[in-house]
Amino acid sequence: ATVWGIYPKKDVPTSGNVFTFTLGDATQSAQKAELQNTMHMLAKGTVNGTTVTNLKFEHLTALYQFKFTNRRPDAYKVTKVVVSADAAIFPKTLTVSGEEKTYGDKSNSLTLSMTSLDMAKNEVAYGYLSFFPMADMTKDTELTFTATIEKVGDSSSTETIEKKGKISELYNAESVVAGDEYKYVAGKRYGIAFMLVADLGYEETEAGKYLVKKEDGLINLASEPTVMTNAATVITLDADLDMSTKEAWVPVTEFKGILDGNGK
C-alpha cells in the first residue's frame, strides 16, 4: 500500500492522491520567518504491515532571503518587499497528481509585508518569502525587487530601494542560479541584499583618509569615535564650509590664537 506525507498538515482530507498547495503574498512580524505554513513538502512511501518505508519528503517551494543593512545614521524599518516580473511566473497554486505538477493562478508579482522590522544604524535584518519555482524562467527573464522603507517614527519619510535586471545580471556565473541554468529550484534559498546608504557628506578615499564635501560631512565624521580618536586620520576639505548655521558646531566661546598647521 502507498502512504503520503504532507507538510504542513492539511485539515481537509485529500482524495484520489491529488494534492493542491497554495501560496500567495506573505506577512512577517519582526525577524521571525513565517515559514511553517509556506514551506510545502510532499512525500510518498510504502506501508509494510505496521512499518512505513521510503518516505522521503520533496520540497515544493523555493525561498527568497532578503538581507537589509542600514548604513544610515537614523533607525529605519522595512514595511514590504515586492518581487515582480513582466511575465506571470509566480503561481499561487500547485496541484500534484502522481508525477505531474500543474501550476495555476499565476501572477507577475509577490509581496512580503513586514511589521516591526526595525534597524538601528549598522544593524542587519532579514525577510523571507516562499514561492513556487517554475521552469518558465530563463537567463533573460527580468526581475524587479522593490523594498519600501521609512524612518522609524516618521511615516511621511517613505521611500523605495530597487534592484532590477535580467536573471543573468542579478546572479553571477558562479551562483547557484547559473548552475541551474538560470532557473529557480525547489528546496533552495536565494539571497537578495539591500543596502540603506546615506549621503554622509564625506567619502573615505583610502584607509584612514577622508574627503569632506559639505558641512554635514564634517559633523558626521566628528560623531565617529573610531575616526576621531585615530591619530593617523587625515581629513581634507574639497570646498570652503560654512558652519554658522549648524547648531551642532557653534562654539561655546570665541576662539583666539594661532593654529599650528605643521608648517603646511
Task: List where the protein language model places each region.
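Short, low-hydrophobicity acidic/polar segments
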Residues: 1-77, 123-128, 133, 146-153, ...
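Short, surface-exposed beta-strand/loop "edge" segments at domain boundaries and coil↔beta transitions
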Residues: 11-17, 74-75, 88-92, 138-139, ...
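Surface-exposed repetitive/solenoidal architectures
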Residues: 199-264
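Extended low-complexity, serine/threonine- and proline-enriched intrinsically disordered segments
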Residues: 76-103, 147-149
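Solvent-exposed serine/threonine-rich low-complexity stretches and specific carbohydrate-binding patches
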Residues: 92-120, 164-169
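Extended serine/threonine-enriched, polar tracts that run as long, contiguous segments within proteins
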Residues: 83-84, 112-162
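Short beta-strand/loop motifs in extracellular/secreted proteins, especially
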Residues: 74-81, 141-143, 233
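Conserved SET/PR-domain catalytic core that frames the SAM/AdoMet-binding pocket
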Residues: 60-73, 82, 216, 255-263
